Amino acid sequence: MRLFGLILAGGEGRRMGGTDKASLTLGGRLLVTWVAERLGPQVEELAISANGDPARFAGLGLPVLRDEHPQGPLSGVLAGLRWAAAAGADALVTAPVDTPFVPGDLAPRLWLAGEGTCAVAEAGGRVHPACGLWPVAVAEDLAAWLAAGEARVMGFAARHGAARAGFPDENAFLNLNAPEDLARAESLLRKDA
């Protein structure tokens, strides 16, 4: 099993006042660094899905994949699947750039839950479909899904009967969508220190 990883960083950050979330800091470190350090050890190769100037990620030494047709997170997943397939990977594990506490066992738990098919994370009774596992075999179906105007991550996951991998810590998937979410994450860091 060859798992590749992808940090989804192509969003517009509207609820953060239009700020590029990858450039936000938490505990003095970039959000993209938090996710890279947590997801990177779980996968064979790691890349970033982002639009705009890729030079802003140069310090990470990771490939930056652009969306062919920006239509939300699934466009990034498609770019990642094509990259992973070209390199001989079996599946792609994704995590958004604004989930800095993503679990250190995300990839293996998704793989075990899905048994080689699609799988998404679940914690605290909530599904987190952007934290998912996507076999490279679904790439062309995803391209057709996007071409038909569909863009919902959970809709595509359901189309492929995605399994759910349960995680005990709901804070592991704390999504930093707004300034108050970032403040909450800072508070959690102080508690853990």
Swiss-Prot record:
GO biological process, any: bis(molybdopterin guanine dinucleotide)molybdenum biosynthetic process
Keywords, alphabetical: Cytoplasm, GTP-binding, Magnesium, Metal-binding, Molybdenum cofactor biosynthesis, Nucleotide-binding, Transferase
GO cellular component terms attached to this protein's record: cytoplasm
Main location: cytoplasm
UniProt GO MF annotations: GTP binding; metal ion binding; molybdenum cofactor guanylyltransferase activity
A Pfam family of this chain: NTP_transf_3
CDD domains: MobA (cd02503)
Key word Transmembrane helix present: no
InterPro entries attached to this UniProt entry: MobA-like_NTP_Trfase, Molybde_CF_guanTrfase, Nucleotide-diphossugar_trans
Top EC class, one word: transferase
Subcellular location: Cytoplasm
Cofactor: Mg(2+)
Positions annotated to bind Mg(2+): 98
EC identifiers of the protein: 2.7.7.77
Subunit structure: Monomer.
Function comment: Transfers a GMP moiety from GTP to Mo-molybdopterin (Mo-MPT) cofactor (Moco or molybdenum cofactor) to form Mo-molybdopterin guanine dinucleotide (Mo-MGD) cofactor.
Family statement drawn from the similarity comment of this UniProt entry: Belongs to the MobA family.
Entry remark concerning the domains of this protein: The N-terminal domain determines nucleotide recognition and specific binding, while the C-terminal domain determines the specific binding to the target protein.
The name this protein goes by in its record: Molybdenum cofactor guanylyltransferase
Lineage: Bacteria, Pseudomonadati, Pseudomonadota, Alphaproteobacteria, Rhodobacterales
